[in-house]
Amino acid sequence: MLSEKYRPTKWDDFVGQPVIEDIKAACGDSWLFDGCGERWLFESENIAGCGKTCAAYVTARALGCSEFATERIDSRSCTIADLRELATSMHTYGCGGNGRRAFIIDEIQHLGQACQRMLLGLLESLPKHVIVIGTTTSTNWADDVDGLYSRWRRFRFRKPNAPEIADHLERIAGELGLTIPPGFRFISYVQGKCGIELKGNNIRDCIDQLPDALRRYKGKARAA
């Protein structure tokens, strides 16, 4: 998929998300890992494709966790047994000089209630070389487990700015040498006005659908 080619791998790659500056600044806080581990939550309200998971990986690198010391946990298939194993694994140091390890719990809202309760216990006693980063498109996922939501340092992702996405897509089209039909406007495409239904300002979706949108727009122009 084309969006994989343009997945953000550094801070400057993110588009239309002011919260990235907040996360970047937080990575420089002097008290991080001072006596206990870190638990950060990258959340949005029903907004997918806005960079949360990519930001989790960039954050892990910024905090000194190597690729081999960063582990993704799929919350859809996560079980109590998996979390028990994780609790033991966390006490092993990473391969970097600081020994840090990052655990990214993707789409954390899919954890079952029993797993959420166990996660609460894990977060309360994280080893000081560990950061757990949760990503979620829900802001009420932890309502049934008292105290779980408040355990996180939270960063809210918003719906990306349409003009910024349009500029980003135009740059991508230029890099790929895509033909831009006369009359095609990137801002109209982002707004879903070019014959392709997009999922809000979902950057991933906008990138993946772009080549087909350009071809269809060109075909319609010829037919007219």
Feature locations, PLM:
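Pre-Walker A (pre-P-loop) alpha-helix and adjacent loop at the N terminus of AAA/AAA+ ATPase modules
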Residues: M1-E45, T88-G96
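A short helix-loop-helix "switch/interaction" segment in the helical subdomain of ASCE P-loop NTPases
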Residues: E43-G49, F184-D205
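Conserved AAA+ ATPase "SRH/arginine-finger" region at the nucleotide-binding site
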Residues: E45, D74-S77, R153-A166
